[in-house]
């Protein structure tokens, strides 16, 4: 099938496949409609007005195979969305921090200002609900100010919003993250407006033994607008520092925003059901409210979300470990590959590489693999890392690496930019990198290429000819002006200048609750390229690594 063809979808009614006898009845009707459409001028035929979406189609097939029972709660494909850019700034839906390309001193942080302003404006437009999720600690500094200023504007406009704020808490590390304290802090900052704002504030850990908690970063307002990506609301990492983390969110409106709300309802349903267990959930509320597990559903009712544009989007998340064991409706039976170098002495059960049930409740993992697999010419990956902290986690996702190896072997160009390994913490995950050297990525790709091709020479040709790999820089200088290495926190995959993922899900093994959007729009992908991928490579190519055994290349 060529890239400009869209495969036919199986006929459905209310989300279910049609029975054969019902399908048989539709055949004469469909033939008649086909005849009519064929007779129409091309300008009025439906297909002429609907651009092909080969990437989303491939991903949707994977999702229906892996997690059919989670459609509408953890993943959903929608049309009629709009990338939420302000007038006069068509690429303004892309929210980068700090946005000071080319300046190691990062004096003008235009991207950060745009992000905080967008957060405030979205919240200020609320009439009913505001839904926020992040990794602990709670939003502070300028991020908290954006939330408070937006809520004050809502109340000043005569509304009484319901607000949920959910953070994922790592055991022990986040013992000082106390929802009741944050609730009280918000009430104090809201002042007189606090009486009109109903709060649910919670921290949650779904599995201590499998290291699972919320990692999604969402701001959903009235189920109509959403901001999501990799940015945590932490002032010390993003705002009040001379070496801010480079990160990206995206903003949209339309049915995909409602999809994000449904995902948050799924997380809050678990949170509310476990609110009496302090080993799992700490909850604080205001104004006598109870826990609100279905706030988004209650707001939306049975009315479908209104379309606001023409952009097709797949919203896709994951449930990590501890919320749901498996999707009982899934007939998914993968052939799970193995690799001896994914284990590091004593480790945890390998959910990423060796657990079919985990796959069925974490559809985002196969969605990202399918996005990469759908590439025909090139793949751009911008991530904190591709390898995890091993132990306790497995070193890498075998199927993701195998998919990348398959692309390299097929002549597809692959560019990977990751956070400078100099950001590695004392135990790997203590900083914004988990590797000591870029060789850990290129050596793994070579190993998987040899396993795929069975030939060292073929593997070398594919690796040397088609891979670009670099550590992140945002200016010509090797470090920030204060001498600190550049930290990258993107969770971004783009293919063929046509489709891309922006969200909170890393490509390395991590069993968290995550969420993101996969967008297929050549126009938006070109904006992403111009505003982020091109400047990123302009500076990062100076830190490009040549894989072992490959001839040195000129940067470019």
From Swiss-Prot:
It comes from the Bacteria. InterPro entries: PLD-like_dom, PLipase_D/transphosphatidylase. GO terms for biological process: cardiolipin biosynthetic process; lipid catabolic process. This is Phospholipase D. The keyword Lipid metabolism applies. It is found in: Secreted. GO terms for molecular function: phosphatidyltransferase activity; phospholipase D activity. Belongs to the phospholipase D family. It comes from Streptomyces antibioticus. The keyword Secreted applies. May be useful in the production of emulsifiers. One of its GO terms (cellular component) is extracellular region. PANTHER family: CARDIOLIPIN SYNTHASE, PHOSPHOLIPASE D. Optimum temperature is 60 degrees Celsius in both directions.
